[in-house]
Curated annotation (Swiss-Prot):
Compartment list: Secreted; Nematocyst
Disulphide bridges, residue numbers: 43-75, 52-68, 57-72
Annotated protein name in UniProt: Kappa-thalatoxin-Tas2a
Other notes: This protein is also called kappa-TLTX-Hh1a. The TATX abbreviation is given to this protein, since the abbreviation TLTX was already given to a spider family.
Keyword Disulfide bond: yes
Signal peptide location: 1-22
Amino acid sequence: MKFQMIAAVLLIAFCLSVVVTARMELQDDEEMKNGSFQKRRTCIDTIPKSRCTAFQCKHSMKYRLSFCRKTCGTC
């Protein structure tokens, strides 16, 4: 009986992970078609001097995985 409960819980968890993954992929496809994917990932060229530090100027990117330039242009 205990084994059946564990198997059922694992099966439900697997099914939920498949559903969530499929929904995320579908949402990304819709965003690519609508152009909102790029709008959401647009970058800024500069950040306020008050927020700049040496480390931030060296490493800061608004979105690491997009085509953005460094954001510390005004430091």
